[in-house]
Curated annotation (Swiss-Prot):
Gene3D superfamilies: Glutaredoxin (3.40.30.10). This is Calsequestrin-1. It is a peripheral membrane protein. The modification Phosphotyrosine is found at Y43. Detected in skeletal muscle and in smooth muscle from vas deferens, aorta and stomach (at protein level). The modification Phosphothreonine is found at T124. It comes from Rattus norvegicus. Glycans are attached at N350. Belongs to the calsequestrin family.
């Protein structure tokens, strides 16, 4: 489904190995008693993950409402590869244990031994988790940890459209700002236009939340007319109405596909690879900012203002990463990008080799203004700032070193 390199070929193995330790580090130490209500699950030793093959795959699919399959290449004979595969299995086993009562099953499909089954199921990308629910197939493009995978699958179990029926639910809807969201106003669940909307929602579930209301009072507060659908870009206050209501499923899907890359979007554990692979000409504009930190919050607010002022520019897309969401990756990012993530940063990253160049802050105590940030972004979009310039500087430094040796 996705053939692009994930954060660079060399970066992938390190990144994935780091993510695998989440399960181990997140498990309470043995001998430490948790209070009632805070008893974290520990693997009970029961094998629940199924090796799916040509003989059993039909029965496996009949057994579970939702089935998550890890499509993997055969582990190599060396100790490190064997250990890594065991850890991946353990992550799936713990997730299977937690979700056993929810009717969620887990399986393994070997890309060599079970190639025929993989072909029938449409599995194409090794080391990916494919989730099957009814007629829908969802590729999980998130962090490979038990907690994140469980959270994702719980979302999969939810209905693709959430109904807004009162003031509190409306307030909760309005508080969602860090992801795309849609809301439509329809006569009832039996409306053919609502059913088209629901079918469209299934295409993006659970990555993009779809909401609907049948309440005229709620619709009035949202300035929605009957059968009208509003699309909210992430971090944008004002929606865009999908034109030519009432809309068919195909029209809704097409509109979302065309507009799903927000001007400012947040890297999230449950969709990190999907976001990273959606680059513009092989690069990302990346901003690091801790929302809980005063400087990070101020910088993020400036980013939001710049994004809102430039939302009509299809060439501008900024990925915001909150380091607090990825503590295990902070040392890796600091080393790879040669930056200090204790302070806000913004730069350009080449997705192929992770080469990067970062905005110089004139004064560490004075963060860039919206105008300064816009000027820098304009230089990036015009190609005046790019990672190749940084390579040239490195070459010059190497030449200087050679001269010193002479």
């Amino acid at each position: 489904m996705r053939a692009t390199d994930r954060m660079g070929a060399r970066a992938v193995s390190k990144l994935r190995l780091a993510l695998l330790f989440v399960l181990v580090l997140g498990t309470p130490r043995s001998g430490v008693q948790g209070e009632d209500g805070l008893d974290f699950p520990e693997y009970d030793g029961v094998d629940r993950v199924i090796n799916v093959n040509a003989k059993n795959y039909k029965n496996v699919f009949k057994k579970y409402e939702v089935l998550a399959l890890l499509y993997h290449e055969p582990p190599e004979d060396d100790k490190a590869s064997q250990r890594q595969f065991e850890m991946e299995e353990l992550i799936l086993e713990l997730a299977a244990q937690v979700l056993e009562d929810k009717g969620v099953g887990f399986g393994l499909v070997d890309s060599e031994k079970d190639a025929a089954v993989a072909k029938k199921l449409g599995l194409t990308e090794e080391d990916s988790v494919y989730v099957f629910k009814g007629d829908e197939v969802i590729e999980y493009d998130g962090e490979f940890s038990a907690d994140t995978l469980v959270e994702f699958l719980l979302d999969v179990l939810e209905d693709p459209v959430e109904l807004i029926e009162g003031e509190r639910e409306l307030q909760a809807f309005e508080n969602i700002e860090d992801e795309i969201k849609l809301i439509g106003y329809f006569k009832s669940k039996d409306s053919e236009h609502y059913k088209a909307y629901e079918d469209a929602a299934e295409e993006f579930h659970p990555y993009i939340p779809f909401f609907a209301t049948f309440d005229s009072k709620v619709a009035k507060k949202l300035t929605l007319k009957l059968n009208e659908i509003d699309f909210y870009e992430a971090f944008m206050e004002e929606p865009v109405t999908i034109p030519d209501k009432p809309n068919s499923e195909e029209e809704i899907v097409s509109f979302v596909e065309e507009h799903r890359r927000s001007t400012l979007r947040k890297l999230k554990p449950e969709s990190m690879y999907e976001t990273w692979e959606d680059d513009l000409d092989g690069i990302h504009i990346v901003a690091f900012a801790e929302e809980a930190d005063p400087d990070g919050y101020e910088f993020l607010e400036t980013l939001k203002a710049v994004a809102q002022d430039n939302t009509e520019n299809p060439d501008l897309s900024i990925i915001w990463i909150d380091p607090d969401d990825f503590p295990l990756l902070v040392p890796y990012w600091e080393k790879t990008f040669d930056i200090d993530l204790s302070a806000p940063q913004i730069g350009v990253v080449n997705v192929t080799d992770a080469d990067s160049i970062w905005m110089e802050m004139d004064d560490e105590e004075d963060l860039p203004s919206a105008e300064e940030l816009e000027d820098w972004l304009e230089d990036v979009l015009e190609g005046e700032i790019n990672t190749e310039d940084d390579d040239d500087d490195d070459d010059d430094d190497d030449d200087d070193d050679d001269d010193d040796d002479d």
